[in-house]
Curated annotation (Swiss-Prot):
Species this chain originates from: Homo sapiens (Human)
Proregion positions: 36-61
Family to which the UniProt record says this protein belongs: Belongs to the Wnt family.
GO cellular component: cell surface; clathrin-coated endocytic vesicle membrane; endocytic vesicle membrane; endoplasmic reticulum lumen; extracellular exosome; extracellular matrix; extracellular region; extracellular space
Subunit and partners: Forms a soluble 1:1 complex with AFM; this prevents oligomerization and is required for prolonged biological activity. The complex with AFM may represent the physiological form in body fluids. Homooligomer; disulfide-linked, leading to inactivation (in vitro). Interacts with PORCN. Interacts with WLS. Interacts with glypican GCP3. Interacts with PKD1 (via extracellular domain). Interacts with TMEM67.
Record's protein name: Protein Wnt-5a
Location relative to the cell: Secreted, Extracellular space, Extracellular matrix; Secreted
Known function: Ligand for members of the frizzled family of seven transmembrane receptors. Can activate or inhibit canonical Wnt signaling, depending on receptor context. In the presence of FZD4, activates beta-catenin signaling. In the presence of ROR2, inhibits the canonical Wnt pathway by promoting beta-catenin degradation through a GSK3-independent pathway which involves down-regulation of beta-catenin-induced reporter gene expression. Suppression of the canonical pathway allows chondrogenesis to occur and inhibits tumor formation. Stimulates cell migration.
N-terminal signal peptide: 1-35
GO biological process: anterior/posterior axis specification, embryo; atrial septum development; axon extension involved in axon guidance; axon guidance; BMP signaling pathway; canonical Wnt signaling pathway; cartilage development; cell fate commitment
Disulfide links within the chain: 104-115, 154-162, 164-182, 238-252, 240-247, 309-340, 325-335, 339-379, 355-370, 357-367, 362-363
Gene: WNT5A
Length: 380
């Protein structure tokens, strides 16, 4: 299915009278949360909008027209401007960031680096200052999360500047099937995510050929890879109509893929990520020219990964001491690899689970609680 990608014009919202009050409540609460958080900030990031949801205020009366975008930690100047223009979008930027963070932690739950977050607005700590393949994945999955959240918010009528998808009818859709319904607006989600997420990188100016300029190019590439993964995995969904489920007629629409599928695809890209360097013209090129050049959907990195085996404040590595491991596994979650050869401790723990469940007419399921003593293994 062919999908078109356009360019967002922030001026679309200038003529709007204002966004919904609920979005203002969200922004005010978020600003209050960060203003009282006493933390050491190493490097602000918009990812912080996905951390620690502020207290929901059901009835707040705000005097004044503008939300407190300028007080939100983690936003660049360009992102703050977009915040002012699109007040009702910010809640879904936060939801997208949260979705990306959770997916990162799921995908790396059995790895030495498990996408741990820290208690400040850098979210992932100093480890993101290294242009590693882990950083590449994090940028990609976070950008993907924003596309996902924005596209769905449009479909659900939560935003003032978009609605259901207007994607063209696929050419391979049978003629007697209707193209309609209310699909996820992936075009809009893609465009706004690109405008917002890339704003910080595009504002940064560094000398041509510098390490900082290489990081900007790396970040922009991986942001795009995340967005395109969501875009390309979207597919047609259909609903049958007809007497007694005969499905004599179908209505179809464009639908986002489950985000786990996006995470799985990006994890595969992480495993095959391309090592890059800056050439004399200030462009990223592959370190090993024998391989095919990475596409816009591949992940790229410029630094080797730090040693995640031991705690290191300078690199942000938390180490693997105290991590649970699987004694019988030969994979990355196995005690030999997870514990980096340091060995492991064994202890017993009591687990309680539902068991012996029975269906009773009508209509409920009744279960017993079973306890079991199990062995667990923890890295030294």
């Amino acid at each position: 299915m062919k999908k078109s990608i356009g360019i967002l014009s922030p001026g679309v919202a200038l003529g709007m009278a204002g966004s919904a009050m609920s979005s203002k409540f969200f922004l005010v609460a978020l600003a209050i949360f960060f203003s009282f958080a006493q933390v050491v900030i190493e490097a602000n990031s918009w990812w912080s909008l996905g951390m620690n949801n502020p207290v929901q205020m059901s009835e707040v009366y705000i005097i004044g027209a503008q939300p407190l975008c300028s007080q939100l930690a983690g936003l660049s100047q360009g992102q703050k401007k977009l915040c002012h223009l699109y007040q009702d979008h910010m809640q879904y930027i936060g939801e997208g960031a949260k979705t990306g963070i959770k997916e990162c932690q799921y995908q790396f739950r059995h790895r030495r680096w498990n996408c741990s977050t820290v208690d400040n607005t850098s979210v992932f700590g100093r480890v993101m200052q290294i242009g590693s393949r882990e950083t590449a994945f994090t940028y990609a999955v976070s950008a993907a999360g924003v596309v996902n959240a924005m596209s769905r918010a449009c479909r659900e009528g939560e935003l003032s500047t978009c609605g259901c998808s207007r994607a063209a009818r696929p050419k391979d859709l049978p003629r007697d099937w209707l193209w309609g319904g209310c699909g996820d607006n992936i075009d809009y989600g893609y465009r706004f995510a690109k405008e917002f997420v890339d704003a910080r990188e595009r504002e940064r100016i560094h000398a041509k050929g510098s390490y900082e300029s290489a990081r900007i190019l790396m970040n922009l590439h991986n942001n795009e890879a995340g967005r395109r993964t969501v875009y390309n995995l979207a597919d047609v969904a259909c609903k049958c109509h007809g007497v007694s489920g005969s499905c004599s007629l179908k209505t179809c629409w464009l639908q986002l893929a489950d985000f786990r599928k996006v995470g799985d695809a990006l994890k595969e890209k992480y495993d095959s990520a391309a090592a890059m360097r800056l050439n004399s013209r200030g462009k990223l090129v592959q370190v090993n020219s024998r391989f095919n050049s990475p596409t816009t959907q591949d992940l790229v990195y410029i630094d080797p990964s730090p040693d995640y085996c031991v705690r290191n404040e300078s690199t942000g590595s938390l180490g693997t001491q105290g991590r649970l491991c699987n004694k019988t596994s030969e994979g990355m979650d196995g005690c030999e690899l997870m514990c980096c050869g340091r060995g492991y401790d064994q202890f017993k723990t009591v687990q309680t689970e539902r068991c012996h469940c029975k269906f009773h007419w009508c209509c409920y399921v009744k279960c017993k609680k079973c306890t079991e003593i199990v062995d667990q293994f923890v890295c030294k």
